[in-house]
Amino acid sequence: MGYAYRIDDQHGVYFVTFTVHQWVDIFTRKIYSDILLENLRYCQQHKGLKIYAWVIMSNHCHLILSTESFKLSDVIRDFKKYTAKKIYQAIENNESESRKQWLLWLLKKEDHIWFWEEGYHGEEIRTKEFFDTKVDYIHYNPVRAGIVEKEEEYLLSSCGDFYGVRKGLLEIEPF
């Protein structure tokens, strides 16, 4: 594992990116993004995960997070492993998935499910200025992708919480 992927301070605040293998557009289907959200909630409730900002795009997600009681690298490892398995199973069981055979072929190598790209590009956040830069980057992602005109319009994001537009889909923490 390279230096860019290391978590030096297991209880520090980090900006991370999880990318779907081969940048496959999987989270265009609500069933799969819901699995991601459910597992993030589980980690918040049972593993002490704190989420400060987040966005789920079609083929990746960005989060700013930390943890209190568990090692952050362990929580990330378990999260990626569990969501990979659950999303792969959801694809297998989804009769209406038009890309089913192709996705199953692409996301499995030998006997191993390969849903996520390796690593998570963790960057430790130590200052409010760097935090604000990363929050802006996260929330503007759907605008850059041409999905929405204003970042607060995108539902799979913490932006609504930040602007006070709506309660988001995940609990977020103040920095």
Feature map (PLM): residue ranges:
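Short catalytic/metal-binding and nucleic-acid-binding patches
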Residues: 1-175
